[in-house]
Amino acid sequence: MSKNYVEMGVYYMDKTIGLVRTVSRMSDYKTNDPMIGFVKVGEGGVASEMYAMPENVFKEKFIH
């Protein structure tokens, strides 16, 4: 896994958020900044609703 690129379909772990899987790339409609769409992976592998986070924030949180 690259240290400066968020890959799609990959699992990432954070102590506060937990296990997530990236599902899409998107853009903020106001600023046109890149965003990452992801789902939280719960007990038994069940996915949550989709969340979005700015790509730079996602990198800081999940890619150390």
Task: Enumerate the language-model features and the residues they cover.
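Intrinsically disordered, low-complexity sequence elements enriched in Ser/Thr/Gly/Pro
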Residues: 1, 19, 23, 57-59
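Basic/aromatic-rich interaction segments and small domains that mediate binding to polyanionic partners
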Residues: 13-51
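Short coil-to-beta transition motif at edge beta-strands of beta-rich domains
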Residues: 3-16
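Short intrinsically disordered terminal tails
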Residues: 1-4, 63-64
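Intrinsically disordered, low-complexity, charged/polar segments
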Residues: 44-64
